[in-house]
Regions:
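Active-site-proximal substrate-binding groove within the catalytic cores of carbohydrate-active enzymes
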Residues: 9-13, 28, 485-675, 686-699
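Short Pro-Gly-centered flexible turn/kink motifs
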Residues: 263-282, 693-701
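Polysaccharide-binding surfaces and accessory modules of carbohydrate-active proteins
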Residues: 2-240, 259, 665-675
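Solvent-exposed beta-strand/loop surfaces of large extracellular or lumenal domains
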Residues: 240-254, 665-688
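Conserved, mostly hydrophobic/aromatic
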Residues: 10, 123, 268, 381, ...
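Active-site groove signature of glycoside hydrolases
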Residues: 340-350, 438-471
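Aromatic- and glycine-enriched glycan-recognition loops and surfaces
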Residues: 257, 315, 319-406, 437-441, ...
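Active-site-adjacent "subsite" loops/lids of carbohydrate-active enzymes
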Residues: 308-310, 321-323, 367, 394-445, ...
Length: 703
């Protein structure tokens, strides 16, 4: 028996090579390994670093239900070799495991990042044998023993935070105990193995339509936590189950049971799993998200947009609602320029005379809406010092688009010999080079003919499990399309490095870091009620970096000045998506918009380097008070919202400022009209807002 111990960036990992070469992952934590923490140490098939399932091979050991544990040949993979080196990010470790029966090998990678308590995990499966193998599951991250530290049973000490995500109610974290999922601990300690399983999955092309591809596990006894994100723009899966007296966490991309995915590996073929990043903390959720935020900045495509954080005006939300005309655009352009916007995006509808939902795909201007052409509008936008943009939806084609009747079926997702469609649209298949060429031609034409520098790339359907045309399985077709789309997107950015493309999917239904490592900006929601939007805004930096999180601000025609302030504060610590009928606001309210944008331009240099904090916790949609902080080395920007309720006073604690000299100011609005005070003794900021539905932006300077 041999041990491999890795200590890197405050992380402790312990692997074991048994005498029969079985490879075990015994420890992953913020503290050194304690052998006594393992209950069922003698179990021969436990603590596997990789779970892999090939069709046609038996599992000799007990498991219950649909757990991806005791997989075959995962249970008898043998250690072969290890490589340990460094690259530009930090240390990188690779283990080679082999199944002697099938001659399938797995290369398991761990990428460390200097100074960060986080690891990116992925696996490459290679068939080095002589027979075709059917791969239907490969873990990206697999760790048994997530409950082993601390003396209390798991159901008394573990809490799971799950980020629910849905249309108009994105980034909605909820906290659960194991008992909430029927996972009470009632079996003998060494034999805990039930059929209960906590699973969070996505099946389809909307990667975040029900949940974000993330999770957080907290051990409340040891005050440690684990935050993970699965980096795939389609189907993914994570599960927590019990086996061998311990709980395990397994995270992966698509699989056969939940995603209709399997892949035939012919001799010599390889398959690379989706990456999973895991951050460990002994300082709480905020610290784990801060680490993840820094990691997300590292893996993201270098781009000017995330350095400049320019302000976008978009004519859709609580404004033109997808029915633009030249006559309506001109006053909006004037008002947006006067307020200080830097991009102006013409949203949906510019390409159709009337109803357009089921006819999209040609992407040519409507002469009825724009008699002198869209170029007249984009030229006017540029004359006002702004960069023009337009809305597109390039992964779909309406069933009544003339092109859809002219191109062959292999342009689209197919199942059972029929085209796949949803909501009167067909799903385009980016594996097809003709589809990619068509998409390129649209991008090229809009840039050359209209001079656009910004594209809002929307996506409003869910094609389900995938396509079985030219694929081993529907899920295989789906994953191959998604990876082809990412490669196409990378090629677009290579051709047009200054082009900004916004990731939108009915709002935030594809918030994942396969997409967001390419896209510089993300639409977070279609939420059209600013009073609810503050919850999405406050929580959004848990899902993506603040400088990628586009938040709508849409002052209403009939509102008052506090309504404007609330709207603006929603967006001021993130990316501003300005909208609303600015030209029709009173001068006082227009001035408040301009004041907010002017202030934003002075603080955005700090936003791109800050990490988020939630001094009173993550927000929920019916909380009376909500706040979000962005912390840098010497200051904290703090957005505070009061909704309805009978509590005009909130005390906001800042334990991290203990024994530090600070000064507090209200940045926005300039008229303030709220009371606030700082207690040096208790490190608490007390804020009083006498009216309901008020918001303010503060700055806490650390001296």
């Amino acid at each position: 028996m041999e041990r491999i111990e890795i200590v890197e960036n405050g992380l402790f990992l312990v692997f074991e090579i048994a005498d029969d070469k079985c490879f075990k992952f015994l420890h992953f934590g913020k503290k050194p390994f304690n052998e006594k923490d393992i209950i069922a140490r003698s179990t021969s098939y436990g603590f596997r670093f990789v779970e892999i399932n090939l069709a046609g091979y038996g599992r000799p050991y007990e498991r219950h239900g649909n757990k991806y544990i005791v997989t075959a040949p995962g249970w008898h993979m043998r250690y072969e070799s290890m490589e340990d080196g460094r690259n530009q990010n930090g240390r990188i470790v690779m283990f080679v495991l082999r199944d002697e029966i099938t001659d399938v090998i797995v290369k398991s990678y761990m990428q460390f990042y200097d100074g960060l308590s986080i690891i990116r995990f992925w696996n490459i499966v290679e068939n080095t044998g002589s027979q075709t193998q059917v791969l239907d599951y490969i873990s990206s991250f697999n760790y048994e023993g997530i409950d082993k530290e601390g003396s209390l049973p798991a159901d008394k000490k573990l809490q799971i935070r799950i980020p629910h995500n849905g249309w108009q109610k994105e980034v909605n974290w909820k906290t659960y105990d194991l008992c909430d999922f029927g996972m009470e601990r009632i079996q003998p300690a060494c034999d805990q193995r039930s059929s209960n399983l906590l699973t969070v999955s996505n099946t389809g092309n909307w990667s975040a339509k029900e949940h974000l591809p993330m999770g957080y596990l907290e051990n409340t006894q040891t005050h440690t936590g684990m935050l993970w994100q699965i980096e795939n723009n389609g189907s993914w899966h994570w599960e927590i189950g019990d086996q061998n007296g311990h709980l395990y966490l397994a995270a992966s991309g698509p699989n056969e049971i939940y995603s209709h995915w399997f892949k035939n590996l012919k001799p010599g073929d390889t398959f690379t799993s989706v990456p999973v990043a895991v951050s460990l903390t002994d300082q709480g959720f905020d610290d784990a998200v801060g680490t993840m935020t820094k990691y997300r900045r590292i893996i993201r495509r270098p781009n000017a947009d995330n350095e400049s954080l320019k302000i976008i005006f978009n004519d859709y939300m609580n404004c033109l609602w997808g029915h633009p005309t030249a006559a309506e655009e001109f006053p909006l352009i004037d008002a947006a320029a006067e307020a200080g916007c830097e991009y102006f995006c013409i949203d949906a509808g510019w390409y159709a005379d009337g109803d357009w939902w089921d006819a999209v795909g040609d992407w040519r201007e409507s002469k009825k809406r724009f008699p002198n052409g869209v170029r007249e509008i984009t030229d006017y936008i540029r004359s006002k010092g702004m960069i023009p943009g337009v809305w597109l939806e390039l992964e779909v084609m309406g069933i009544n688009c003339h092109m859809a009747q002219e191109v062959p079926d292999d342009w689209f997702f197919m199942r059972h010999g029929k085209r796949v469609y949803d909501r009167s649209r067909y799903q385009l298949d980016y594996r097809n080079p003709e589809v990619r060429a068509y998409a390129d031609s649209v991008i090229d034409r809009l840039i050359k003919e209209y001079g656009v520098g910004y594209i809002k790339m929307d996506y409003n359907i869910e094609p389900g499990i995938g396509t079985d045309l030219h694929a081993d399985s529907a899920g295989d077709g789906m994953l191959s399309h998604e990876r082809a789309y990412l490669k196409w997107l990378e090629a677009v950015f290579k051709r047009y490095p200054d082009l900004v493309i916004e990731n939108c999917s009915s709002g935030g239904l594809r918030m994942d870091y396969a997409m967001l490592s390419r896209y510089s900006i993300q639409s977070t929601s279609d939420q059209d009620n600013y009073r609810y939007y503050c919850t999405i805004a406050a929580n959004s930096p848990s899902a993506l970096t603040p400088e990628q999180s586009a938040i709508w601000s849409y002052p209403l025609r009939e509102g008052d000045r506090e309504e404007v302030v609330f709207n603006m504060v929603n967006a001021m610590l993130l990316r501003i998506h300005q909208s609303g009928h600015l030209a029709e606001l009173t001068q006082e309210r227009r001035d408040l918009v301009k004041e907010a944008l002017d202030i934003y331009k002075t603080i955005r240099k700090d936003i791109k380097n800050s990490v988020p904090i939630w001094p009173i916790g993550l927000s929920h949609f019916h909380d009376e008070w909500t706040c979000l902080g962005l912390q840098s080395e010497n200051k904290i920007y703090l957005a505070v919202w009061r909704r309805n309720g009978n509590k005009p006073v909130i005390e906001i604690p800042f334990e991290q400022l203990n024994n530090k000299e600070v000064s507090v100011s209200c940045l926005y609005p300039s008229y303030s009209e709220v009371l606030f005070s700082w207690s040096k003794e208790s490190n608490v900021l007390t804020v009083t807002m006498e009216k309901e539905f008020m918001a303010r932006l503060f700055c806490i300077e650390i001296k």
